[in-house]
Design a protein with these regions (language model features):
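Positively charged, low-complexity nucleic-acid-binding target-recognition regions
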Residues: 145-147, 151-284
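Substrate-contacting helices/loops that form the catalytic groove of nucleic-acid
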Residues: 3-5, 11-157, 235-284
């Protein structure tokens, strides 16, 4: 393969080398009209909805656990440095690097699992939500700021982007404002409203104007998809939006935890479980 360029970047007392090469594979665009939509969060790292299978919630607690483990060790080192009026040390820089490496590895496992799911289900359209406040760190609250900033969402999105291109699929990145507040079931436009049709009664639960209970992250994921297809050609838009609005909505998400030691056999069993859990629907 022809090397395009090599990049060497100093980072936390060490050097990281990236090699970028040209991929000469001839890739045909995926023509499938089936779709998935991904909402990124904290406790549910990825909330995946589709017209092919029940919603899948990827557990985000293992990522939180990694951050908490390293944050505790970093805080302990920083406390010892205070007496010497120092703010950093070789050990602290090493901990930051190790945390980054660990999260980078976990994001690869998660993105690879999602791509395998997409290939397994022959999905042609993939949408992921994006929140500019992940970088701006505004109006999320002190605790949420820290949690969101320490989860490398853009790394996950970038990995999905290039892995999907190899499958002939272009990832649609959709700004996600108001997708968690507006009711997908009530066909409410995803924009600021004087009065919202639905509401979040408690954490993880969204209730529509008709009193229908739905997982809050599932509602957000479907709204992200609804916002994204407005930017597509009208013919494609009509074909895609007719699927979720006409068939109804799945009520019981399938919760999946990707262990650090997940084997190929374990992954295939999870994909099979998703495949046999076809949507249980009700009329809107």
């Amino acid at each position: 393969k022809e090397i395009k360029y090599i990049e060497i970047v100093p980072q936390n007392g060490r050097y990281t080398m990236s090699i970028v090469y040209n991929n000469d594979l001839e890739i045909s665009p995926n023509q499938s009209t089936d779709w998935i939509s991904i909402d990124l969060g904290i406790n549910n790292l990825c909330s995946i909805t589709s017209n092919k299978f029940v919603p899948v919630l990827l557990n985000g607690k293992p990522i939180k656990s990694i951050n908490q483990k390293f944050n505790k060790r970093i805080a302990s080192c920083q406390k010892k440095l205070k007496s010497n009026d120092k703010k950093s040390s070789k050990k602290i820089r090493s901990l930051y690097s190790k945390r980054g490496d660990k999260l980078h590895s976990e994001m690869h496992k998660i993105s690879s699992f999602i791509v395998d799911l997409i290939k397994d289900q022959n999905i042609g359209t993939v949408v992921v939500g994006y929140n500019p406040e992940w970088k701006q760190r505004c109006s999320l609250g002190k605790k949420n700021n820290q949690k969101f900033v320490q989860i490398p969402y853009m790394k996950l999105i970038n990995q999905l982007q290039y892995k999907l291109l190899e499958q002939g699929i272009e990832l649609i990145i959709q700004e996600e404002s108001y997708t968690s507040k507006c009711s997908f079931m009530d066909k409410e436009p995803c924009c600021k409203q004087q009065t919202y049709k639905g509401n979040r009664e408690k954490r993880g639960l969204f209730i529509t104007s008709k009193g229908v209970k739905i997982n809050a992250d599932v509602n957000g994921s479907l709204n992200i998809f609804k916002k994204a297809i407005k930017n597509l050609e009208q013919v494609v838009q009509d074909e895609l939006i007719s699927i979720p609005l006409n068939t109804g909505l799945v009520m019981n998400p399938l919760r999946v935890t990707l262990r650090t030691d997940l084997s190929q056999i374990d992954q295939r069993s999870i994909l099979l479980k998703i495949k046999i859990n076809t949507p249980m629907v009700f009329n809107v």
